[in-house]
């Protein structure tokens, strides 16, 4: 596993040396020797990669070589970065620093010679050894199981308040629970639904908070102690009909910790999943426990065939006899477990020839004969399949997949951030971008991993892309092999070695401080808010090789330590929700940053010196929502930006935007007077812009010249407007290909529908928070031909809605929320046969009564599968 990863690292380092060879004057001899030695490493790793399973000596050697590669990269980049900083400083400083140049050259010469000696030592002792050749969503039968479980949850006569699914890992417990959770009968029966991934290292407070966000969203922003959470949830679950899914509970005592929020004999139900049947018995000794069976050989073949031949799912299609024979031999090693079948299918779906199948079948047998370090006897064959699937990944995907091991179990990973983590660590090499954005490359990698069933993710309905992902716990065990190889470490890791990456999730600050004494640390991620801590001045001084630094929620109080300017290798820096009031001017040294998030806590007014103009490599920039009045930013130099958030006209010039021609996403906050034609002119230069948000402050204040706003952006698909205006601009002011539009706080006095319905590509429309202040709204025949989702929320003056026959013929989901004066749903809904879901959230009992079965308006919604009242 590490051999391939290292080959990737050596190739990346080789590219760096070739690209920058002209900049090593004064150390040419040592440079050329080092480059020659690296070539030896490449040859060694190619040989080692082929025979990694049979030799402990090879494994140990690879670990030592890995340290050499990392140290080489650190030395080379430090030398190059110092030279670059020298070029960008004034003449006086350059003359003053000239005396340091020769010592720097002597130091790198000595460092290079030391590295060459280390490589030579490896070459002499280990690399000459030879290695012996060794040639060694798709579901079946789920419907009945889902129906059975749904029945136990919704039937009135079933008194079991806890329903359980138990069985070994990979048998499909979570998949089954997810199907039940999303079942239309369940959605219509329960007023609130909550899903919680419990995991081995859960905290009770986290579980309770997650449940509260779903069953009592009005309390989300309230800070509560555990006792307060327990009391609030106990009351809510005593009055509301809710389904809580507790996925992956490990121990009986874990249930005991969570259980106090559930009052006896009320309308709530729990669906839990666990590998441990004892958990189910502890939760409800007399409750219904469902145990999925392993798949039969016939069912296994059906699943496998559907995955590997996705376009040929007909009984008439004939699979090549020899491939079918090989396939049936391979699936025997999956043990009837759906997870293993999906992963094996994901592996073979990208291989099309009989010879490739024979090779993979030989590798499966080789793994089982040769063995790996997995010790679970009951599932050893399954682990071998998963391990082989990893090894069959392309090199670039292996590196990116192993990176996921550092995140906690069941942690939901944000894919935009992950794309930048990968880029900051140089995992996709420069040629992979070839003009594509960092996010697009990351999306492509995730799509590959999803296709191979190595990660779990679902496309977002609005953006049509993967936004988050996570690992199945068994797949994560394969991924965690990386920790043994000293590549990463999580906060709870027991590894005595010094890793290059560290993830911190709350925890003991004393223990964390000990781990931060490692000067070779390259990546530090805080994934929970840490609270007050005063040790960062020392950390920044010590951790000068850092590439990725995510300081989510860290409380600095006042000024960020100036020593952060020493982290000259940083490519990723996030201060999201951190607490700070001043950024130091030393941050101007962070010229290699690709990603910079300065969106600190909203309560903080922060001062930012005018150093952002020097960060020419930036691809992502998120500015604070509140900045000191003295802040003036020049951003016109940031021509590589792909995403700019929270740009304020109070602190920056709109004219700077026209130079950011690579922008895909932009949010603008307009404060004070602004010429709309100037803004439109700048936006017209952004030919690749896909997502635009424009907000005007103060809210509900008239804005002059709004009729001059023309959004002439060729690629614009998503538009969010929070601008006070009595009337929408005419439809020709909007891009014809706009897919989503969201309006809020506009106070439109004229009905916006006659304009919006002429934007023929609209897929989703949201009108919220007083976006419309009129009384009557009409959707006419032929309007909104592509619309699938419509949200009408917080329209306090709206009384009447007319929908003509032929309007919104593809509408799938409708939400009506907090529209207190709306008298009734329109008669025309009965013509929209595509409607699948209607959600009505109103404090109006008569409204619900009329739409319920037997009510006078029931005919309007009787064709809709799911109608929910909250």
Curated annotation (Swiss-Prot):
It comes from the Eukaryota. ATP binds at residues 167-174. GO terms for biological process: defense response to other organism. CDD domains: RX-CC_like. LRR repeats lie at residues 543-567, 568-590, 703-726, 735-758, 759-786, 808-833. Keywords: ATP-binding, Leucine-rich repeat, Nucleotide-binding, Plant defense, Repeat. Residues 123-432 form the NB-ARC domain. Pfam families: LRR_14 (PF23598), NB-ARC (PF00931), Rx_N (PF18052), WH_DRP (PF23559). Gene3D superfamilies: 1.20.5.4130, Helical domain of apoptotic protease-activating factors, P-loop containing nucleotide triphosphate hydrolases, Ribonuclease Inhibitor, Winged helix-like DNA-binding domain superfamily/Winged helix DNA-binding domain. GO terms for molecular function: ADP binding; ATP binding. The LRR repeats probably act as specificity determinant of pathogen recognition. PANTHER family: DISEASE RESISTANCE PROTEIN RGA3, PLANT BROAD-SPECTRUM MILDEW RESISTANCE PROTEIN RPW8. Probable disease resistance protein. Belongs to the disease resistance NB-LRR family. This is Probable disease resistance protein At1g59620. It comes from Arabidopsis thaliana.
